[in-house]
A protein has these predicted regions:
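A short, conserved alpha-helix within the catalytic core of class I
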Residues: 475-491
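C-terminal alpha-helical "lid/dimerization" subdomain adjacent to the S-adenosyl-L-methionine
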Residues: 500-538
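Conserved class I S-adenosyl-L-methionine
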Residues: 434-448
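A conserved beta-strand element that flanks and buttresses the S-adenosyl-L-methionine
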Residues: 468-469
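Extended, composition-driven regions rather than compact fold-specific motifs
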Residues: 1-296, 300-317, 323-325, 336-345, ...
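Hydrophobic adenine-recognition pocket in adenosine-nucleotide-binding enzymes
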Residues: 472
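Short acidic low-complexity segments
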Residues: 151, 455-464
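Conserved Class I S-adenosyl-L-methionine-dependent methyltransferase catalytic core
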Residues: 334-436
């Protein structure tokens, strides 16, 4: 296996009941959950599948309400997925199951007790997940969703490195119990107190190293990982901890071990902004923590310039003297002020923030890349509103759709954004359109959808029984959408459009997204009625709409029989 493959799983809302609790160490609370909804069950006329959790690091999402009744924040269950509702009271936390026994109707979750010994295990200092677990009693209910997917791990490995802090222990325990790959393991675990040390079921060729590290210690875990003597052959590196503590481990995996991206899975389970806030973080993955460095437009442009000019790479490798960067001095001064760089005895070094910008593409894309270019188009929004053209077109001379054809980076970004459609495949693959013999595919998400239904993508040519468009409209202006749909009439009598038609409750600030969308294509994000209006303008009739989850709708169009 040369790459990691994501296996989508049906998203199902489940109500479980606490069967027992146990403090397995002073800093780890175990909760055993049961109930008929761990197996196949029925709700509201829907037959819903049993819980599956095939990967040792898969996670389920726990649902809480910060105020009021949890029933008011629960997502809506649809046939093959869920629809999150927007709610200020909605709180979710992700946890890795230690064990799942569907036949025995038992799910086991472990919760790190960050506040152990403080007397605040169930108080305001505890995160919402920790507080719930410490207060849980048999009979209490818990609502969960997921896993949304599982990542197949590579099998062409000779040894595995597992590293993390206390939040990684559930995944490590499950790996050792199930052994998805039968190879020697080197395990490095950081704990905040000796009381968190545990006995794991190690194999004869496994080795484990325990290190003491405070919550704000970003060096001890990485140093212990760097001390691991590499074994012969190809490694697989898995790590989970506080996001910034993982930065040197990312470098170690790629530079020292030579681990390919397909053989590296390093996830920030939480982000520490202040030592006292650790308890509130719980154990949820946060691959792209928000960086509090943009205090003005000037700092945004400074960070963008540092990324685009390669200055951060120069500092990371050479640690140049500050006085040697005469021409760059104003830029360096701003980067020092916003905590991207630090001056150590006259030499420049990256801070944790600078490291994050350099090694985490999800963080960097806020300042450089297509997403940042879309934000930059807002500079021309006022002029664009006067002309009736999108701000992107005013700024670049091309529409966004034209840019996607002309520039590989824009096209690749759209394909990357559509990659998330893989999580909706359990619903998408049930659409009646896929019973047709000859199907064409188009749009940035065409590859994901076609692969999910066992088809291939080819340039549209000739006629088809049906054409499926995956995110084919989102990057187009209204005028371009109508023209595209009119052209589609020459290829088929039936089209299915898979598009986002409402905000996803967990998808970030919808108001900011709507403004950037306006600047990019000249209109607000389209809802179902707007899609229908544009289809009608192109002489199509909407015959069916199906929610496939996450604010996404599959809209079936037929050629208007009144139009030749």
């Amino acid at each position: 296996m040369t790459h990691r493959r994501i296996v989508p799983l049906p998203l199902t809302l489940r109500r479980l009941t606490v069967s027992s609790t146990e403090r397995i160490t002073p800093r780890m609370q175990r909760v055993r959950l049961g109930g008929p909804e761990l197996g196949e069950f029925e709700r509201d006329g829907l037959t819903l599948p049993a819980l599956v959790c095939p990967g040792f690091d898969d996670h389920v999402k726990l649902i809480f309400a910060s105020s009021g009744d949890v029933a008011d924040v629960l997502p809506k269950q649809v046939e093959q997925g869920i629809e999150w509702r927007a709610s200020d009271a909605l709180e979710t936390r992700d946890y890795t199951p230690v064990r799942l026994d569907v036949h025995g109707r038992e799910l086991v979750l472990d919760f790190v007790v960050h506040t152990a010994g403080t007397g605040q295990e169930s108080g305001p200092a505890a995160g919402i997940g920790e507080a719930w677990a410490c207060a849980a009693r048999p009979g209490d209910e818990l609502w969960i969703v997921g896993p949304k997917s599982s990542t197949e791990k590579p099998d062409d490995v000779d040894w595995i490195l597992l590293a993390g802090d206390e939040t990684a222990q559930p995944a490590v325990e499950r790996f050792l119990a199930e052994r998805p790959v039968d190879v020697p393991a080197r395990i490095v675990l950081a704990i905040c107190d000796e009381s968190a040390r545990r006995d794991f079921d190690l194999g004869p060729d496994d080795e484990i190293t325990w290190v003491l590290a405070a919550a704000d210690d970003r060096e001890t875990l990485a140093a212990a990982v760097a001390d691991v003597a590499p074994l012969a052959g190809r490694p697989y590196v898995w790590a989970a901890a506080e996001s910034r503590a993982l930065l040197p481990i990312r470098k170690f995996a790629s530079r020292r071990l030579g681990a390919a991206k397909s053989h590296t899975d390093i996830t920030g389970y939480w982000h520490l902004t202040d030592v006292e806030q650790q308890a509130a973080s719980d154990d949820q993955p946060q691959n792209a923590p928000t960086l509090p460095l943009v205090t003005s437009p000037v700092t945004w442009f400074a960070v963008r310039a540092a990324l685009r000019s390669g200055l951060l790479e120069v500092v990371d490798i050479d640690h140049p003297l500050r006085l040697s960067l005469v021409e760059e001095a104003p830029l360096v001064d701003v980067l020092l002020a916003c905590d991207v760089l630090v001056d150590r005895d006259g030499a420049l070094w990256l801070t944790d923030t600078g490291e994050m910008l350099l090694v985490d593409e999800h963080v960097a894309e806020d300042f450089d890349g297509v997403a940042a270019d879309q934000v930059l188009a807002l500079v021309d929004l006022a002029d664009a509103l006067d002309t009736g053209r999108p701000a992107w077109q005013v700024r670049t001379g091309q529409t966004f759709a034209e840019a996607a054809v002309a520039h590989d980076d824009v096209r690749d970004e759209l394909v990357d954004r559509s990659a998330g459609r893989v999580y909706l495949l359990p619903a998408i693959t049930t659409l009646p359109v896929f019973s047709r013999e000859r199907i064409g595919f188009c749009g940035p998400g065409a590859g994901v959808v076609a692969e999910g239904v066992g088809r291939t993508v080819e340039p549209l040519s000739g006629t088809y029984d049906a054409v499926v468009g995956a995110d084919a409209l989102a990057s187009r202006t209204d005028h371009e959408v109508v023209a595209f749909l009119r052209d589609l009439r020459g290829a088929t009598d039936e089209a299915v459009l898979i598009e986002s038609t409402s905000p996803d409750g967990l998808g970030g600030d919808p108001t900011e997204h709507a403004l950037v969308h306006l600047a990019t294509v000249g209109c607000a994000p389209r809802d179902g009625s707007r899609v229908a209006d544009l289809a009608a303008a192109a002489d199509w009739v909407v015959t069916d709409t199906v929610s496939v989850g996450w604010g996404t709708t599959a809209t079936t169009l037929r050629r208007d029989p009144k139009v030749s």
